[in-house]
Amino acid sequence: MKAPDHLKHKPIIAVSDYDKIDGIYANQTDVRALSVGEAQWDNKEISVKIWRRPDERWSRQSEEIPLHRALDLSILTIASFITDIDAFYPQTSLREEIVQEGKVQKIKDYYTENEATLRPRLEELSKILDKFFAKKK
């Protein structure tokens, strides 16, 4: 299903039929599309949107996230995979902190259990970042 273009967030680039490739939730999700586009509250801003459609209407549960927050979530996610509770914190410019030291391993275990789905996405992220920075030189 295509991202709607008649709602307030205006997609510029979109992933249609995301429900078919949604990682461990593929074919079991109400997320129908992802997009990068004009933010719904300020068309001068760019945001990312997760489009949910559980029935015949687009859900108000669809999430719009400012672009910098989407990048920050990616940084935090990857940093959490390599977290060492004995290391000096923070590890990134986000100034993250360990809130539940006893559960850090749970994140690492989750990655290990889902590596077949997550690793290809991380590898693709690495490749696209390499291309991005190569063009900036």
Range-by-range predicted roles:
Residues 92-135:
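Charged/polar low-complexity intrinsically disordered segments, enriched in acidic residues
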Residues 1-33:
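N-terminal "first-domain core" detector
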Residues 1, 134-137:
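Classical N-terminal secretory signal peptides
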Residues 78, 82-89, 130, 134:
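Charged/polar positions within long, soluble alpha-helices
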Residues 68-79:
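Elongated alpha-helical scaffolds
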Residues 28-64, 83-102:
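A short, structured beta-strand/loop element
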